[in-house]
């Protein structure tokens, strides 16, 4: 990559939130001002030269590069027609449609190459599992169904995808994707109904992260995820079986066994996580962390009370009762804990653990802002391979913005 791009990647991101494009009229918060070069589009050419190298033919690599450039240049929703309009008009639309929906090129090598590129630019801190509900009203897009979103707690019509995000001190960007298909939900529903469907969702969510991490080839790092509505013990066991450390957000009623003999509740059987934390609130300490949301009141530098307690899951199999830490945070010390997490990173102090949980908050914010700008939700085709190809190239476009700090918001997450 060029020296100016490298210095942008390895230095502190500015995230100035100016508008994108070299005269393309992109919307606010996505790059350089009108008439000025867009750093993300400049970086994208270098990025594509590396991560698209698995495409055998030169014309495929060029089409991939042009598609990424179209995503970066086009403001608003990223339709195939709009992308083609940025790179060549009607003839380009037909060519790009075939390249995305009907071609046979593999997307997994590109995702793995993107992970390696990011690791070299800014070493990985954590993997973050981020579900992505995509409301869609039509009948023809792949994966559309009327379904329950356990993370939002409501029904919606659309697609359900699972993203695996690479999070480092300097950037957060997606590198792995799976779509949860209606066929999987229908097969799971059967006589057992909602419980079986929820179990299928949990299994698919965990499997998507484990698969993406294994393919990425990066060093083992913690996985940050939210399992409040999809299962606790089963999810923790899946990641333990895969050899991946995890820190997972849980619900306040999750049953846990206190294993520290010096603390209230030891030997008293399973207690709900909220009660365990309330009994040790007096041991909590202030922890400082950085809020990724620039609109949050009171500035980005925060301090909240937190505590970590040694616990186990009350698993019927004693062999699976592994040592864990329950981490609690109080946004308001006069109230119940605002967030509860369990982790098998039992040697880390509460401060680094709480800051690690904020990677989930950071990615959720990015997914709703820069992820929208990159077109992660905008594929409208009928073919699942087409969705995978689109979301892979949209991830490359998002990475170009993240690497150059032009997502429209900027916050650096230093070492814990």
Which role fits each region the language model picked out?
Residues 172-173, 177, 185, 247-251, ...:
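An anionic, glycine-rich sequence signature occurring as long contiguous blocks
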């Amino acid at each position: 990559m060029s020296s100016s791009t490298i210095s942008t990647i390895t230095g502190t991101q500015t995230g100035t939130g100016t508008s994108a494009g070299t005269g393309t009229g992109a919307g606010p918060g996505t790059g350089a001002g009108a008439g000025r070069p867009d750093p993300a589009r400049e970086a994208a050419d270098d990025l594509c030269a590396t991560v698209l190298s698995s495409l055998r033919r030169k014309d495929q690599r060029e089409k991939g590069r042009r598609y990424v450039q179209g995503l970066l240049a086009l403001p608003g929703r990223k339709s195939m027609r709009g992308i083609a309009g940025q790179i060549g008009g009607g003839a380009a639309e037909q060519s790009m449609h075939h390249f995305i929906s009907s071609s046979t090129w593999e997307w997994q090598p590109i995702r793995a190459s993107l992970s390696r590129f990011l690791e070299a630019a800014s070493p990985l801190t954590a993997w973050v599992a981020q579900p992505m509900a995509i409301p869609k009203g039509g009948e023809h897009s792949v994966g559309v169904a009327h379904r329950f979103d356990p993370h939002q707690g409501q029904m919606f019509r659309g697609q359900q995808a699972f993203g695996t995000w690479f999070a480092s001190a300097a950037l957060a960007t997606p590198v792995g994707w799976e779509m949860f298909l209606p066929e999987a939900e229908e097969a799971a529903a059967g006589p057992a109904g909602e419980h079986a469907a929820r179990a299928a969702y949990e299994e698919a969510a965990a499997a998507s992260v484990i698969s993406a991490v294994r393919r990425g080839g990066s060093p083992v790092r913690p996985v940050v995820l939210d399992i409040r509505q999809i299962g606790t013990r089963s999810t923790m066991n899946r990641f333990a079986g895969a050899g991946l450390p995890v820190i997972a957000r849980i619900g306040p009623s999750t049953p846990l066994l206190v294993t520290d003999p010096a603390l209230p509740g030891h030997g008293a059987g399973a207690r709900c996580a909220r009660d365990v934390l309330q009994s040790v609130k007096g041991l909590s300490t202030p922890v400082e962390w950085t809020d990724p949301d620039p609109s949050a009141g009171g500035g980005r530098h925060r301090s909240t009370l937190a505590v970590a307690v040694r616990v186990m899951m009350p698993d019927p199999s004693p062999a699976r009762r592994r040592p864990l830490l329950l981490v609690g945070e109080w946004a308001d010390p006069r109230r119940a804990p605002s967030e509860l997490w369990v982790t098998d990173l039992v040697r880390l102090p509460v401060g680094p653990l709480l800051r690690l949980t904020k990677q989930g908050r950071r990615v959720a914010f990015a997914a709703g802002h820069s992820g929208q700008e990159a077109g992660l939700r905008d594929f409208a085709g009928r073919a699942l391979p087409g969705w995978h190809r689109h979301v892979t190239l949209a991830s490359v476009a998002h990475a170009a913005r993240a690497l150059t700090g032009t997502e429209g918001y900027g916050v650096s997450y230093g070492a814990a």
